[in-house]
Design a protein with these regions (language model features):
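Conserved beta-strand segments of alpha/beta enzyme cores
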Residues: 24, 70-72, 151
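Short beta-strand/turn micro-motifs composed of small residues
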Residues: 10, 53, 103, 132-133
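Glycine-rich N-terminal loop/short-helix segment of MobA-like nucleotidyltransferase
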Residues: 3-28, 44, 67
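Conserved N-terminal catalytic core of the sugar/cofactor nucleotidyltransferase
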Residues: 1-5, 31-119, 123, 146
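Conserved core of the sugar-phosphate nucleotidyltransferase
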Residues: 58, 109-169
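Short glycine-enriched loop/turn motifs at secondary-structure junctions
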Residues: 18-20, 102, 165-169
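Hydrophobic residues at beta-strand termini and immediately following loops
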Residues: 28, 74, 155
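Conserved beta-strand scaffold positions in the cores of enzyme catalytic domains, especially
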Residues: 25, 73, 128-130
Length: 169
């Protein structure tokens, strides 16, 4: 398992949570959402860990300095989506090696599951891999659109999804 860079997306406003606190700072089982993700990331021993911050920047950066002092932060002033955030985080880094992009609000990730994912990605010599999950109630989440061979075609945000796509779990 080798991964050069991990990018953690932590700029979201957490609108669905209806809280003034940055989404990634909310606690689950005694640790912030972001803390759970960074705990899993520690297992990978990545050369670079970059965390994209936005909403609640000051408090999020303060929290990061306490729980992941070796990580660096990148400010996403205008929310331009996942691709834009990854592009900001990659600026100035070598284009070599595996890059893992994670959402900062996924507390169920483990170091073992990330390592297995990276191993599968590297073994398959894929240009890109997407780790997905099925959710019993996908309301508010994007949908993974696949072809007949179960290959990923695209990711569609719920607001942009057709009625048929909204039935995808």
């Amino acid at each position: 398992m080798t991964v050069e860079t991990v990018i953690v997306l932590a700029a979201g406003e957490g609108t669905r949570m209806k809280s003034a606190k940055a989404k990634v700072l909310h606690s689950v089982a005694g640790r912030s959402l972001l803390g759970h993700v960074l705990h899993a990331v520690d297992h990978l021993k990545a050369k670079n860990v970059r965390i994209v911050v936005g909403s609640g920047r000051e408090l999020v950066e303060e929290h990061i300095s306490l729980i992941a002092p070796k990580a660096s932060t990148v400010f996403q002033e205008h929310r331009g989506g996942t691709g834009h955030a990854a592009q900001l985080a990659l600026a100035g880094l070598s284009p070599k090696g595996t890059v893992l992009v994670l959402a900062g609000d996924t507390p169920m990730l483990t170091g073992e599951s990330l390592a297995a994912f990276i191993d599968a990605h590297n073994a398959g010599k894929f240009a890109a891999s997407v780790l997905t999950a099925e959710h019993p109630d996908p309301t508010g989440y994007g949908r993974i659109i696949r072809d007949d061979a179960d290959e990923l075609l695209k990711i569609v945000e719920e607001k942009d999804a057709t009625d048929d796509q909204r039935f995808i779990f």
